[in-house]
C-alpha cells in the first residue's frame, strides 16, 4: 500500500531574514511527517546550505526598484521568466499548499500557485507588510503575522489574519532557556553588536569610537563581541587594539549568534523582524538602530514594538553617533536593575512556539481544499 505524504512548498528569498523563519517552519512540518520543498533564489547557498527540505528549487528573481526604467523593466522580465519556471515546478511537485515569506523572490512561485489554485499562506515577519506580500495578499487563503499589529495590509486582502509570531530557529529556543546574567559593580560587562545577516557598515564606524569615549573603568570591564563586515574587519580590530581593549572578538559572521545573545547583558543591532523576535524570545535588552533606507520603514516599526514596552531603545541612524552611543552605554551599565527590567519586558513579548502555530495554520489551510 502506498502512503500519501503531502508536500508543502516554502518560498523564501535567500537572506537570513526570510530563510530563518522558513527553516523553522520546515522543521515543524517535518516533525509532523510532512514533506517540505523550498523555492528560493540564487543567494541561498551562502545562507542556508543545510535547509531541511527534500528538494530546493532555484527560481530567477529580481527587485523592480530604483530609478532606472531599464533596470526596472529588466527586473520585471526576470520575474516573468521566474513565473514560467515556477509554474512548471509547482505542477511537478504538486504541493498541498504554498507558504510565502515575503521578498520579491517569492512572487513568481506564490503567484503561480495562486493562478494554479494551490492554497497559499503568506507569512509577514515585519510590523509593516512588505510590498511583495502586499502584491500577493489578495490571492492568499490565510495571512499569518509575526507581530500582533501589522500596517500596510491592502484593503482588498480578505484572507483571515492570524498572529502566529515569527518562527524561531532551534538554537534560539535553546538560548531562550538561559536567564538574564546578573552583574555587580566589578563584574565583566558583555556587549554584543551585530548588523543583521548582511552586516552594517555603521556599526563598524560608530561603535569603536563610542567605546573609545567610555570612562576608563567601564571600558576595562567590557567584553565585546562584534559582527563586522569583511572589508571593515582589519580597521575595526586595529582601532580596538589601539585603545588597549583586551576583551574583544570581531568577525564577519557568528554561527552561534543566539548563544552569544543569551550570554550578553546588552545588544546593539539593527531591527529586522528575526532580530527583534529573537531578542524578545531570549529576553535581552537592546539599543536598536533601524535600517534607514528600507522602502516601508519596516525596521523602525519593528523596533518601536520593543521600545514601547521598555525592552529596547530605538535610535534613528542620524542620531546614532559615537557620543550618543557612549552616553547610552554608560547609563545602561550604571543601572543593572534597569537592564534587568528591560530584559524581563523583552521576554514578555516573546513567542516561543511560533513555528508550531504557523505549522498548524498551514495544515488547516491545506485541509480546507
Swiss-Prot record:
Record's subcellular location: Cell inner membrane
Binding site for UDP-N-acetyl-alpha-D-glucosamine: 15-17, 126, 169, 197, 299
One term of GO molecular function: UDP-N-acetyl-D-glucosamine:N-acetylmuramoyl-L-alanyl-D-glutamyl-meso-2,6-diaminopimelyl-D-alanyl-D-alanine-diphosphoundecaprenol 4-beta-N-acetylglucosaminlytransferase activity
Family annotation (InterPro entries): GlcNAc_MurG, Glyco_trans_28_C, GlycoTrans_28_N
Membrane topology: Peripheral membrane protein
Keyword hit for Transmembrane helix: no
Principal localisation: membrane
Reactions catalysed: di-trans,octa-cis-undecaprenyl diphospho-N-acetyl-alpha-D-muramoyl-L-alanyl-D-glutamyl-meso-2,6-diaminopimeloyl-D-alanyl-D-alanine + UDP-N-acetyl-alpha-D-glucosamine = di-trans,octa-cis-undecaprenyl diphospho-[N-acetyl-alpha-D-glucosaminyl-(1->4)]-N-acetyl-alpha-D-muramoyl-L-alanyl-D-glutamyl-meso-2,6-diaminopimeloyl-D-alanyl-D-alanine + UDP + H(+)
Protein's job: Cell wall formation. Catalyzes the transfer of a GlcNAc subunit on undecaprenyl-pyrophosphoryl-MurNAc-pentapeptide (lipid intermediate I) to form undecaprenyl-pyrophosphoryl-MurNAc-(pentapeptide)GlcNAc (lipid intermediate II).
PANTHER family the UniProt entry points to: GLYCOSYLTRANSFERASE (PTHR21015:SF22), UDP-N-ACETYLGLUCOSAMINE--N-ACETYLMURAMYL-(PENTAPEPTIDE) PYROPHOSPHORYL-UNDECAPRENOL N-ACETYLGLUCOSAMINE TRANSFERASE 1 (PTHR21015)
Name of the protein described by the UniProt record: UDP-N-acetylglucosamine--N-acetylmuramyl-(pentapeptide) pyrophosphoryl-undecaprenol N-acetylglucosamine transferase
Amino acid at each position: 500500500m502506498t502512503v500519501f505524504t503531502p508536500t508543502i512548498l516554502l518560498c523564501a528569498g535567500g537572506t537570513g531574514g526570510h530563510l530563518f523563519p522558513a527553516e523553522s517552519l520546515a522543521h515543524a512540518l517535518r516533525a509532523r511527517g510532512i514533506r517540505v520543498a523550498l523555492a528560493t533564489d540564487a543567494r541561498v547557498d551562502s545562507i542556508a546550505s543545510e535547509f531541511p527540505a527534500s528538494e530546493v528549487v532555484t527560481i530567477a528573481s529580481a527587485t523592480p526598484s530604483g530609478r532606472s526604467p531599464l533596470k526596472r523593466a529588466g527586473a520585471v522580465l526576470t520575474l516573468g521568466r521566474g513565473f514560467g519556471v515556477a509554474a512548471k515546478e509547482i505542477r511537478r511537485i504538486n504541493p498541498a499548499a504554498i507558504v510565502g515569506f515575503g521578498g520579491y523572490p517569492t512572487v513568481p512561485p506564490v503567484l503561480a500557485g495562486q493562478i494554479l489554485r494551490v492554497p497559499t499562506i503568506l507569512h509577514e515577519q515585519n510590523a509593516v507588510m512588505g510590498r511583495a506580500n502586499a502584491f500577493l495578499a489578495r490571492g492568499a487563503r490565510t495571512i499569518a503575522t509575526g507581530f500582533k499589529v501589522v500596517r500596510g495590509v491592502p484593503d482588498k486582502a480578505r484572507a483571515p489574519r492570524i498572529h502566529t509570531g515569527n518562527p524561531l530557529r532551534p538554537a534560539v529556543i535553546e538560548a531562550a532557556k538561559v536567564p538574564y546574567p546578573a552583574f555587580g559593580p566589578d563584574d565583566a560587562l558583555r556587549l554584543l553588536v551585530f548588523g543583521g545577516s548582511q552586516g552594517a557598515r555603521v556599526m563598524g564606524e560608530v561603535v569603536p569610537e563610542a567605546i573609545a569615549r567610555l570612562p576608563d573603568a567601564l571600558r576595562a570591564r567590557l567584553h565585546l563581541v562584534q559582527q563586522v563586515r569583511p572589508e571593515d574587519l582589519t580597521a575595526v580590530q586595529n582601532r580596538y587594539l589601539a585603545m588597549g581593549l583586551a576583551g574583544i572578538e570581531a568577525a564577519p559572521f557568528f554561527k552561534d549568534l543566539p548563544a552569544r545573545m543569551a550570554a550578553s547583558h546588552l545588544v546593539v543591532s539593527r531591527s529586522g523582524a528575526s532580530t527583534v523576535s529573537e531578542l524578545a524570545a531570549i529576553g535581552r535588552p537592546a539599543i536598536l538602530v533601524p535600517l534607514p533606507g528600507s522602502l516601508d520603514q519596516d525596521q523602525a516599526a519593528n523596533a518601536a514594538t520593543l521600545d514601547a514596552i521598555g525592552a529596547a531603545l530605538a535610535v534613528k541612524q542620524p542620531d546614532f553617533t559615537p557620543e550618543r552611543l557612549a552616553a547610552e552605554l554608560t547609563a545602561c551599565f550604571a543601572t543593572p536593575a534597569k537592564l534587568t527590567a528591560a530584559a524581563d519586558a523583552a521576554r514578555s513579548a516573546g513567542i516561543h512556539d511560533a513555528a508550531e502555530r504557523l505549522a498548524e495554520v498551514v495544515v488547516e489551510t491545506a485541509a480546507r481544499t
